[in-house]
Amino acid sequence: MTESVLDYMSRLGRDARAASRLLARAATAQKNRALLAAADALDAARAELSHANEQDLAAGRANGLEPAMLDRLALTPARIDDMIEGLRQVATLPDPIGEIRDMRYVPSGIQIGKMRVPLGVVGIIYESRPNVTIDAASLCLKSGNATILRGGSEAIHSNQAIARCIQQGLAEAGLPAAAVQVVETTDRAAVGALISMPEYVDVIVPRGGKGLIERISREAKVPVIKHLDGICHVYIDVAADLDKAIRVADNAKTQRYAPCNTMETLLVHAGIAERVLPPLATIYREKGVELRGDAATRALLGADVLEATEEDWRTEYNAPILSIRIVDGLDAAIEHINTYGSQHTDAIITENFSDARRFLAEVDSASVMVNASTRFADGFEYGLGAEIGISTDKLHARGPVGLEGLTSEKYVVFGDGHVRT
């Protein structure tokens, strides 16, 4: 790690810490002005954004980036529209900062409650997608947090162009420029520095591949909000409605293959397998989904179903591949999910209320669903407006992390000259 990178990151950290104190007391209207002005700046800078993005795409093609990575990197006109709309949408969301709840009198006569406050400085580390710059900056700004954004080197020109628009919005609203800072060096040492500055950074949110997140979780000296895998399950109970089961299991797998809330393993009660699996298998085959199953599944569906290995149950495919297991009942389904799952999102399809309640209580995941597709595990679908990511951790934020997940609470106490006796 070079001294210059350390000095540079320390300067960003100091400036962010100072800006966070100003942001914490900024009025809602002022934060909204910054968001709306940034949206207007993006709209006016479409040509500049496209030019910067083409620089990144050209470099990516020259460096042999895979087509999927190039697709994530591209800022199409539609994606620029989405970024602009995203800023304007966040401006309409309720501001959680300063909200006081649970006010109550205690026997001593003092009144106690909790006030929602920003976390302080949020470090975001992400890969490829320039639109994350807008998502992260807008949510952090609205929740009163300063943010330091370290995007992937492959998107450096795009991120810098987006940052200039955000800076314009901050300036027009009279907010400090250091409220949103983009790391402008591609030196990987910047990541190590960012995750090792607890004096300046309060939390890190990594968004990227498993290797990146594992490294940050292992090395960070700052709390991390993260999820490693999206190994999501749908369990079709013996008391499932057949039409609901087929509709949900189809959507959970085939609506999109890459997102982290896509089903990777289908569990089916043995008592309903013969009725539900053949029609589902037909749908999957027509859509080009490769099926892998246990012995019972292969015996039922035919030789074109590949043998599922132990590794399959632990794999997030992000592809048209599905593992299927026939289980004896609810106990076996819950045991499988808690053994092989990633604590992300899991669903049961059933008309049995007690089975549904048991599933909700005993499956140890951030989102647990009844008769609904795992694809709903998303900040927008949950009514959060937007999300900065999904957390499978249990401390602080869990599930889709929106504005409230970027805040904390402090106790507020009112008295009238009260003293403790």
From Swiss-Prot:
Keywords, in A-Z order: Amino-acid biosynthesis, Cytoplasm, NADP, Oxidoreductase, Proline biosynthesis
Disulfide bonds: none
Uppermost EC category: oxidoreductase
InterPro entries: Ald_DH/histidinol_DH, Ald_DH_C, Ald_DH_N, Aldehyde_DH_dom, G-glutamylP_reductase_CS, Glu-5-SA_DH, GPR_dom
Pathway, per record: Amino-acid biosynthesis; L-proline biosynthesis; L-glutamate 5-semialdehyde from L-glutamate: step 2/2
GO terms for biological process, alphabetical: L-proline biosynthetic process
Protein location: Cytoplasm
GO cellular component: cytoplasm
UniProt keyword Coiled coil present: no
Main location per the UniProt record: cytoplasm
Pfam family name, one: Aldedh
Enzyme Commission identifier(s): 1.2.1.41
MF GO annotations: glutamate-5-semialdehyde dehydrogenase activity; NADP binding
Domain of life from the UniProt record: Bacteria
Stated family: Belongs to the gamma-glutamyl phosphate reductase family.
PANTHER family, sorted: DELTA-1-PYRROLINE-5-CARBOXYLATE SYNTHASE (PTHR11063:SF8), GLUTAMATE SEMIALDEHYDE DEHYDROGENASE (PTHR11063)
Function: Catalyzes the NADPH-dependent reduction of L-glutamate 5-phosphate into L-glutamate 5-semialdehyde and phosphate. The product spontaneously undergoes cyclization to form 1-pyrroline-5-carboxylate.
Name of this protein: Gamma-glutamyl phosphate reductase
Species, as recorded: Pseudomonas aeruginosa (strain ATCC 15692 / DSM 22644 / CIP 104116 / JCM 14847 / LMG 12228 / 1C / PRS 101 / PAO1)
